[in-house]
Amino acid sequence: MKLLFDNLPASLAPQRETLARCFEAMNRMMPLRAVYLFGSHARGDARPDSDVDLCIVADGAARQLEAAQSFRRGMRPIPAKPAFTLVPITPDRLGEKRTAGDHFFRTVLKEGVLLVTQD
C-alpha cells in the first residue's frame, strides 16, 4: 500500500496521521487497490464538521455493506473524529460502473483525490 499524501487537501492536513492509521487498518482487513477522497474535502469546500468521503477499491469489497462493516471494525481503535463515509467497491465493479457511465462513480474518478494505491 502506498500513501499519496502529497495529494491530501489542506482541510485534511491536520488529520494526516489519523488517515494513515485508518488506511493501514483497512489494508489489514482487506488489501487496498486504491482509495479516492471525494465530496467536500476533494472539492475544497469542506466545513469543520464535514465528513471524510472515501471510495475504497479492494478485491474483497464484493459485498459493500459487509466490506464497510469490516473496514469500520478495523478502524475502531482510531478516534471517531472526523466522521468517515465509506463506499467500498471491487476493481471489476468499478470498471463496470465506469463503462456504464454511472454518474456517481464517474464523478468520484474524475473529481476525486487519489490517496492510496497498491505498492
Give each language-model segment a name.
Residues M1-A34, R43-P48, A58-D119:
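Catalytic core of pol beta-like nucleotidyltransferases
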Residues F38-S40:
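Glycine-rich beta-strand-to-loop/alpha-helix junction loops that act as flexible
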Residues D53-V57:
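Short beta-strand->loop micro-motif that forms the acidic, two-metal-ion catalytic signature
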